[in-house]
UniProtKB/Swiss-Prot annotation:
Similarity-based family: Belongs to the NusB family.
Name this protein carries in UniProt: Transcription antitermination protein NusB
GO biological-process terms attached to the record: DNA-templated transcription termination; transcription antitermination
Biological role: Involved in transcription antitermination. Required for transcription of ribosomal RNA (rRNA) genes. Binds specifically to the boxA antiterminator sequence of the ribosomal RNA (rrn) operons.
Gene Ontology CC: cytosol
Protein origin, superkingdom: Bacteria
Key words, A-Z: RNA-binding, Transcription, Transcription antitermination, Transcription regulation
SUPFAM superfamilies according to UniProt: NusB-like
Length: 133
């Protein structure tokens, strides 16, 4: 599983967890194809995003102009949470690479406007987090 696929599967897993009251292991099982093995990167994205979700949600909430996190679409919320986790906690991946991958995921699911929205929210949230460190 390459990193692009891992990100896609992680978003799908996180999306499920916002919609259905199931545990993370069941969501992972539901997401992966029978022949797919979860990569270490995928596991890090899913579990790390969930572990730091409260902190991540705080930064995202501060930067959602005219929105609340609950009003944000489930897919956009999953992409934003995962993207910000990766930007803040996975130092081996350049921030601009993570940002671009999140934008591409958003555009694939929601079009160009979704990509612009994710770009703005993640950029501002990351900048705020860096000022607070």
């Amino acid at each position: 599983m390459n990193r692009r696929v891992a990100r896609l599967r992680a978003v799908q897993t996180l999306y499920q967890l916002t919609l259905i009251d199931i545990n993370v292991d069941k969501a992972i099982e539901n997401t992966l194809n029978d022949e797919e093995e979860p990569s270490e990167f995928y596991n890090t994205l899913v579990h790390g995003t969930l572990e730091h979700q409260d902190e991540i949600d705080g930064y995202l909430s501060e930067n959602l102009k005219g929105y609340t996190l609950d009003r944000l679409g489930h897919v956009d919320r999953a992409i934003a949470r995962m993207g910000l986790f990766e930007m803040l906690y996975l130092d081996d991946i350049p921030v601009n690479v993570t940002l671009n991958e999140a934008i591409e995921l958003a555009k694939a699911f929601g079009g160009t406007d979704a990509g612009r929205f994710i770009n703005g929210v993640l950029s501002n949230s990351y900048d705020m987090a860096m000022k607070n460190k």
